[in-house]
Amino acid sequence: TYSGINFKDALAATGKGKILRSSVLNGGIDFSGIVAGSDSARFSEGDEVLVCGCGLSETRDGGYAEFARVPVNCIVPLPDGLSLHDAMALGTAGFTAALAMIRLEENHQSPPHGPVVVTGATGGVGSIAIDMLAGKGFEVVAFTGKQDQHDYLRQLGASDFIDRASVEMGSKPLEQAQWGGAVDNVGGDTLAWLTRTVKPMGNIAAIGLAAGFKLETTVMPFILRGVSLLGVNSVVMPLEMRDRAWQRLGADLKP
């Protein structure tokens, strides 16, 4: 079996985040492996499968173990195009980025609408999102404080960069519209700034809160520009959407 090391795993291991809901749990919020036994007709011994979220390392033991037992509605068949290793190389970060892409597509985000800015660009979700967006023909702007990582981000597909420290975020209900859309891993003031600077009918996929969970904005971007704020939750997700995202990770969204 394989399992990744994710941001939430680090928070759980260091005790810096309220991740573990029980005092003794195996870590690992995702894993891939081979079915050793099943009470469900959906899976048989020997099937290759994967699991992301579903309370792993929060309310039940996670993937840092030789064996794991999980509800059948959390399990996704390994898609064609991915090995067990590939699946966890992408892991929760890839799954989350794929969900963000699907949400943007469903709300009619398209390359002609303008550049898409990705915050937290050098992180797992940000890096994979840049690759996916560029692969679909979007102009991608990387928002980062790590100037020494520009070459890396350019290789992924970013065509321009925003230095986090140099941004004047302003305080008006609406600022100059610059972005066709956004994938935000940061939250806080950065997400509020994005709501004020995304173009009319643009979308923001909100994924993370590395800079804080409070969002201080107004209704103006939503009612005057038609901006849509799209939440992305990789933990609680219908099985159909889980399977759909992983199928695409093995096909057109594969890095």
What kind of feature is each model-predicted range?
Residues D189-K254:
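Glycine-rich phosphate-binding loop and adjacent beta-alpha segment
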Residues M88-R164:
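Mid-domain Rossmann-like dinucleotide-binding core that forms the NAD(H)/NADP(H) cofactor-binding site
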